[in-house]
A protein has these predicted regions:
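Functional cores of ribonucleases/endoribonucleases
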Residues: 3-141, 145-159
Length: 163
């Protein structure tokens, strides 16, 4: 998926609000979810040992979230055996995203994936951060490969957890 495609998705689903305290909140998106960027993961955040930072602004961050979250739940027209499902990790603890078959960096320290943990309360906003492939599940990797989100080379790297 090219950046122009990502921007089209972003323009379709983006609703950005700014609260009185200048917090930015996006959504609800097509799944009805609200997204609130975590300032310590922002592209301009101070470098912290245990926090990854996005390579681009909050709009980009929300677009990446929507790649993982907004899906129809219906079979793909070109392959009715495969369902267009959210990119939930095998353990059910959150969503993963990858952009442009993993060719583009998402994080400032080389991360090519993003993780969006499920909020503790259903009404809470989502947030996410760039990450590596240490905890990604094989079923999700298989799904991405089956719908051509990733190439065979990236598929192999993800299964070995070296991306």
């Amino acid at each position: 998926m090219e950046l122009s495609s990502l921007n089209r998705i972003y323009n379709l689903v983006m609703r950005k609000r700014e609260k009185e305290n200048h917090e930015v909140i996006f959504g609800p998106n097509g799944q009805g979810h609200v997204y609130k960027p975590a300032p310590y993961h922002g592209c301009k955040a101070k470098k912290l040992k245990d926090k990854t930072r996005w390579i681009d602004d909050a709009n980009f961050e929300f677009s990446i979230f929507n790649l993982a979250d907004v899906h129809t739940g219906l079979p793909y027209p070109e392959n009715i055996k495969v369902i267009d499902k959210r990119w939930m990790n095998d353990d059910g603890k959150g969503l993963y995203a990858i952009f442009n078959q993993g060719k583009n960096l998402l994080g400032q320290t080389g991360e090519r994936l993003a993780f969006f943990p499920i909020p503790p309360n259903a009404q809470d906003p989502w947030h996410g951060y760039p990450t590596n492939s240490q905890y990604i599940g094989d079923e999700l990797v298989e799904h991405w490969y089956s719908i051509n989100v990733i190439s065979k080379g990236i598929y192999r790297k993800l299964l070995k957890h070296i991306l």
